[in-house]
């Protein structure tokens, strides 16, 4: 009877197993089976497939095409190019006058275009000038970049009902610098104006004489000045519109020999730049001394006119000068 009780107690204390075990071997077997069971459970849990999350089907968004824009250098607002063209390149937020190409300026100024003058002239390279690249190569790059053959464009046409000759510098073309072709075109513009007794209007924007042509460039200052004098003697009006910027040999010649000088707001006008003058005289100069408004206050120019009023202002002045 005792033996049976011992058998029952031993059977109840032993773990369930397929084979009989006893003593320390039983404890080790229990630990191994428990560890195996836990390892098997963990592996099976990790190997379970991750359920997919149900998502609402949304339409695929594509990139929205935006119109090219330009940042205003004054107020840093972004303006679409269409809005700039419609507003004559004047910022609608701060009224800053942005740069225009010569052709855009003239086509917006004239009501009717009859002919373009000076296309037969082409630049030569008599000095075989080389800076960072040969002069002919630089000219080719500028022509490709701007779509123009030179820094001055001359158009003959009408402003309202008045026959005029108008020319404009393109600052993109080597800084609007004046070389022999620019001089040739301006002289031809003056001669056509003289022949047709039509007023001459010049929109100036230049860094000065073109260094790549040396003394030939400087000679254009004398040629253009002589052509303007012939207009004056014949009583033909010559109006200069000073845009931003006008410097150097252009300021010292054709840009300051007009019967009337008009400037756009905040245009920079001078012979040498502020830094060069300060280094020469060794003095700190007043900041706005080359601004159009400062020059107007000191009697250097006659008017500062907003770009939107430029056409009407020039026409009224010409009507008075020609007694129309």
Curated annotation (Swiss-Prot):
A zinc finger (C4-type) spans 72-94. Residues 1-51 are annotated as: Disordered. Residues 22-35 have a biased composition (Basic and acidic residues). It catalyses: N(6)-carboxybiotinyl-L-lysyl-[protein] + acetyl-CoA = N(6)-biotinyl-L-lysyl-[protein] + malonyl-CoA. Residues 68-324 form the CoA carboxyltransferase N-terminal domain. Its main location: cytoplasm. Its EC number is 2.1.3.15. Acetyl-CoA carboxylase is a heterohexamer composed of biotin carboxyl carrier protein (AccB), biotin carboxylase (AccC) and two subunits each of ACCase subunit alpha (AccA) and ACCase subunit beta (AccD). This is Acetyl-coenzyme A carboxylase carboxyl transferase subunit beta.
